[in-house]
Amino acid sequence: MSGLFHRLLKPALALAGVTALAGGLSPAASASSHRWVSTHTQALHLSGTRLGRTSSSRRLEISAVLPLRNQSQINGLIEQRTILSHTQVVSRFSPKLSSARSVEAYLRREGFTHLSISGDRLLVTGQATVAQAERAFHTKIDSYRLNGKLVYGNVKTASVPASLSKQVKAVLGLSDVPIGVPKLATASVPDTSGFTPQAVANAYDDSKMPAATKTTVAVIASGDMTSTIANLRYAEKEFQFSQVPVNVIYDGPKAGIVNDNPLTGNLEWDLDTQYSTMVPKAVKALDIYDVGTYTDPEVARGFNLFVSQDKANLLSASLGECDYIAFLDGAMLTTDEALAEGALQGQSTFASTGDNGYACPEVASSGVPEGPPGVSWPSDGYYTTGVGGTTLLADSNGDVEEELAWVGGGGGVSPWETAPPWTLQANPAGQSWQYTNQGGRSVPDVAAVADPDTPVLVYGSTSGSPEGVGGTSVASPVTMGLFASVQTAHDNQLGLASYDFYSLYNKTNPATVENGPTGPVYVPDPDPSPVTGFRDITLGTNGGCVAKPGYDYCTGIGSLQSAALSGAL
């Protein structure tokens, strides 16, 4: 999971407001003639060396993010497991076409070119110079040298004219600081003693489940996938699996994503493609969403493409950063909206919680907790299933002796992301939003094997032996693969995974409801029982919490047990 995560200093956390300035919408008018309204995209003050203003002629790709409609109805439909078609979701919940056209027209008047509206009308994307973007969004963009790289970021909150304040909630693309490139923990010498996909399936009660041939899974990746697909074919042969259909879906022109991309051939993509498809024995298809860079805007647009295409049932994202960054730049809001639509369509997204234990993943994680407390985005997304890490003590067949919380597994409570209502009986901290209007989302929701000392075997080439690798980058595709088996057994009608998991927990361990100053307050069962479909992990620590019976910030509800989970659902 981890890698070179970027860090910010002195984030501007002021809530959106209005600057009282008179004026109209004419692009010829000066910025001071508008009455500007702040969006959710706030100022970023980067910790690197500030180099001054970014070249005014530099070209940027910018997305204006529009709000969903009828948001108060979404969770009720999810809790009813009502699955809608993409057409129904767009008709009831997506922004109106007229709103998207209004935003598109504004950007065109401001000089934006190559404008497009996403299939769900959530994003209006176009190209502009820095000068045009600064004028259109009343902001300022500076350049920095950060960790040896030249990057840019907006140092002033992005705003829109008051007449567009109800159409634009955030702006993506005003910064390009990359999310950390995943760096899997591998053995210093070749190690073939790790778990095979068959052993992992056995460890998590999936061996006797039917192959997930009705379910399409997806992963997020970057670069030329030629070697990744070749390695998948080699792994299928060596591990004795049938070949699965693979589709590479580019979030933009292929040449711009593939050519000279330093992420081409990353071992992360081999892990994701091999374990998401082999743990469930087979899948209907594997979709690889290939994004140009690992910046927040690219990843957010990739998530939205997964939803707006509505081809895959499940998505795994082995990536992350300190969640306050995504909160500030608008990526958190964007993916929450996109994945809300996905949840209505019956799609689920899984994301690894990081390899820095209780700490914010600001630096290359080593599996040893260090730094200030914090959690990782996108694993803490409102509709995401965050997957933590375990140490899996089992024999080569996957017969389990014990499963412990892994010290590097990310976990904790977000001060930025709100907790979904179905999590509150398990996690009382989630109720803090009643007092602060934000925050309380805790991760992980579930967990799976991640410890590099109990690794899984991955083929990173088309010859030789597999490598033993670890990290929560393992846990996310493994868990998605397990849930793919369960979804196939239920004809893909289970709906949002995180709601399914917590509904079982809440049924087994109902909380006591008390009256609080702002409404009902849940008091969790002080002596929770194991939940059918999960292995309750009660030993181990991630440096900030200790695993215990029931829900905890190390391993969530526990690790999936596919056959039992399928029966319980």
Descriptions of predicted regions:
Residues 1-31:
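Secretory targeting and sorting signals
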Residues 383, 392-393:
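Intrinsically disordered, low-complexity acidic segments that are enriched in bulky aromatics
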Residues 401-405, 415:
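Extended ligand-binding clefts on enzyme/binding-domain cores
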Residues 393-400:
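Short acidic, Gly/Pro-enriched loop/turn segments at secondary-structure junctions
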Residues 118-120:
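Short glycine-enriched loop/turn motifs at secondary-structure junctions
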Residues 32-116, 125, 130-386, 414-471, ...:
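Substrate-binding/charge-relay-adjacent region of secreted/lumenal peptidase catalytic domains
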Residues 487-553:
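An often Trp-containing, charged/polar helix-loop segment at the C-terminal end
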Residues 482:
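Walker A/P-loop NTP-binding active-site region of P-loop NTPases
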